Each structure stands twice: as structure tokens, then as C-alpha cells.
């Protein structure tokens, strides 16, 4: 019998490398999903790819929501779902989001 996956296991640890984070996003899609929190709100990452940007771990390094992780790697988020909202392509999401370049999204 398989162990049920707890929602907490979906929390993204930005100090992991990009390949591991992408594996979590893909492996936990569609439920329970991989997520991060920002200013008390949960954001579920639905689709992402490995980027090549540099920055501090957990830092948003582009206006199109690319986030730095360990080993000088990054994750480019392509599709996201804000808590209680419908899924959005990142090009739509960034228009009304308060997550901007320079924001830090470290999960505590």
C-alpha cells in the first residue's frame, strides 16, 4: 500500500537544486502540488523549467518570475495558481502580482 502524500511535502525548498525542484513540481502535479508562500499567501507552481539565472537562493531574478535556487541555477515559472484563484500563465499573472524582481520567497 502506498503512503499518502501530505500537502506539506509540496513545499518548495529553494536551497535545493533546480532539477530536484522541477522533479517535485512534476511529481506532485496536479495534487497535492508544489508550492511556495509569499506574504502569507500560497502559490502553487503548475509548470516550470530550469533557467540559467543567478541570484540569492529564493530571490526573484526576473520580472517573469524566475527564482534562484542552489548551485547557481534557477527555475522559470511558466504557470501558477494563487491560493483561491484560477491557474494562470505567468505572462498574465505578473500583470497583477505583487511578486516582483528582487522579491525573496523563502519558505520559513
Regions found by a protein language model. Name each.
Residues 3-16:
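Acyl-group handling in specialized metabolite and lipid biosynthesis
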Amino acid at each position: 500500500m502506498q503512503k499518502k502524500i501530505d500537502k506539506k511535502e509540496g513545499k518548495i525548498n529553494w536551497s535545493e537544486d533546480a532539477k530536484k525542484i522541477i522533479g517535485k513540481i512534476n511529481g506532485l502535479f496536479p495534487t497535492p502540488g508544489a508550492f511556495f508562500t509569499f506574504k502569507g499567501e500560497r502559490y502553487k507552481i503548475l509548470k516550470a523549467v530550469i533557467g540559467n539565472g543567478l541570484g540569492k537562493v529564493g530571490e526573484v531574478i526576473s520580472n517573469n518570475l524566475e527564482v534562484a535556487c542552489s548551485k547557481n541555477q534557477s527555475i522559470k515559472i511558466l504557470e501558477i495558481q494563487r491560493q483561491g484563484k484560477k491557474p494562470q500563465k505567468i505572462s498574465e499573472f505578473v500583470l497583477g502580482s505583487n511578486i516582483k524582481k528582487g522579491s525573496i520567497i523563502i519558505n520559513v
